[in-house]
UniProtKB/Swiss-Prot annotation:
Function: The alpha subunit is responsible for the aldol cleavage of indoleglycerol phosphate to indole and glyceraldehyde 3-phosphate.
InterPro entries, per the entry: Aldolase_TIM (IPR013785), RibuloseP-bd_barrel (IPR011060), Trp_synthase_suA (IPR002028)
Protein's name according to its UniProt entry: Tryptophan synthase alpha chain
Gene that produces this protein: trpA
Catalytic activity: (1S,2R)-1-C-(indol-3-yl)glycerol 3-phosphate + L-serine = D-glyceraldehyde 3-phosphate + L-tryptophan + H2O
Family annotation (NCBIfam families): trpA (TIGR00262)
Amino acid sequence: MTARIDAAFARCRAEGRAALVTYVMAGDPDPETSLKVLEALPKAGADIVEFGLPFTDPMADGPAIQAAGLRALKAGQDLRGTLALVRRFREGDDRTPVVLMGYYNPIHTYGVPHFLEDAQAAGIDGLIVVDLPPEEDEELCLPALEKGLAFIRLATPTTDEARLPAVLANTAGFVYYVSITGVTGTATPDFGRVSQAVSRITAHTNLPVVVGFGVKTGAHAAEIARGADGVVVGSALVDALARSLEPGDRAGSGTVEAVTSLVRELAQGVRSTAKAPAGA
């Protein structure tokens, strides 16, 4: 299923721009609203969607995404329900790549072979599992690749030259560069160093490199887009959704628009910025 991911980046390259990768939490604030948001993202300008798997112990996530996960869990969202939402999304959109992002525990509990069968059938294109290092590739990464699912790795400012080949060895789809250290949504990246970091990674791989963590505005997205193949935005979108909720964490009449209006701003930032030449 990496074909959809490859095609998305090819379209963006043809337009001379970076891709916009948007993250939302599955089931936040409830499954039906979550599906409406998912369906609206590509129409607002998202090229690729990361769909978060709610989990009780999200160690790499900041307060915004932790709160989103709790709202989703409270609404009854689980892995089976998340795959069901993607199946419904695919009824109307067979073009936009969907990448599941989360932690290994729910997948392990579901059962890896069963999960991979169901994920493939639902129309999932790739996986980001933040707590499975390369040393544990046999657990999920290699079986996922055999099923045709991309397994996407994270690289960070602390990933040195000795570690990078291991991180990239079985990566497929794209590489996700975490532009700051720490948890999501808690700082602003050093935009000046992003292009240098991307160049360091692309010296070791031909895969697209997307950059995330700390991108909050269209201006931020435009800065990142100059030197990366894609810009990832998550916490800012989750925050926008949270601010739109009514008491009791209920979706309001403007909840979907709260997310998509920011996506349109981010898409404008990405689309207004020509990518810098390699090495610039």
